[in-house]
């Protein structure tokens, strides 16, 4: 009887371990892990978008400030320095620098050189304004993308919370079912065997007591 109880107890422990494995390795848990990965990727992308937006806004401020300072300044401008400055600005933003071969010629008089440099500045000014418009457009698109990404993140978080809640409900339901259909019957069977053992022991005790009485009666005879 004792061996049977031990066997049933071991079987019960094995079934409980299997239940835990089924709970923690369920498809719902795998889906949640995948959702967490997607959320992390989306958050990373949002941060990159915000950094890019800040960079573009800084570039626009620098470009706009440079143009306004140049156009509103009443002081004489160092044309050569301004051309080099604006060319560096264009190169930093992936644009080709604007130069004129004639400005390197020593055969031109001062007025001709001024005209050449003025032409370079006008072309640079046109390119800078074009770059400003492109930056504004990229900024608007980035802001739209950022807004869409934030809405997507909110949607995913809501879906994730719903999936987690559903997963918890299904897990609790599964545990209750396992407990009702397997654990309780095993406990009932174990208790039944215990009662049978107790009854068997009581019978043995009664038989032993009866046997002692018979021995006493036999000894008296």
Curated annotation (Swiss-Prot):
Keywords: Cell cycle. GO terms for biological process: cellular response to pheromone; re-entry into mitotic cell cycle after pheromone arrest; regulation of cell cycle. One of its GO terms (cellular component) is cytosol. Signal peptide: none annotated. Component of a complex at least composed of FAR3, FAR7, FAR8, FAR10, FAR11 and VPS64. Present with 1540 molecules/cell in log phase SD medium. Participates in the control of the reentry into the cell cycle following pheromone treatment. This is Factor arrest protein 7. The lineage of its organism: Eukaryota, Fungi, Dikarya, Ascomycota, Saccharomycotina. The gene is FAR7.
């Amino acid at each position: 009887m004792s061996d049977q109880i031990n066997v049933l107890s071991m079987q019960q422990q094995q079934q409980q371990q299997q239940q835990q494995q089924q709970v923690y390795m369920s498809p719902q848990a795998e889906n949640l892990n995948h959702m967490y990965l997607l959320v992390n990727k989306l958050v990373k992308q949002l941060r990159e978008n915000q950094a890019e937006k800040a960079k573009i806004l800084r570039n626009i401020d620098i470009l706009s400030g440079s143009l306004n300072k140049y156009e509103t300044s009443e002081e004489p401008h160092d044309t050569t320095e301004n051309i080099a400055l604006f060319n560096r600005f264009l190169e930093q933003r992936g644009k080709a620098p604007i130069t004129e071969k004639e400005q390197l010629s020593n055969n031109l008089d001062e007025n001709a050189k001024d005209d050449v440099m003025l032409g370079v500045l006008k072309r640079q000014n046109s390119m800078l304004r074009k770059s400003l418009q492109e930056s504004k457009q990229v900024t608007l698109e980035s802001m739209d993308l950022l807004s869409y990404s934030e809405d997507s993140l909110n949607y995913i978080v809501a879906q994730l919370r719903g999936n987690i809640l559903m997963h918890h409900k299904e897990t609790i339901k599964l545990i209750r079912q396992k407990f009702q259909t397997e654990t309780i019957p095993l406990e009932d069977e174990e208790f039944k065997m215990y009662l049978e053992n107790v009854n068997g022991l009581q019978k043995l005790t009664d038989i032993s007591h009866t046997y002692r009485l018979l021995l006493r009666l036999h000894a008296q005879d």
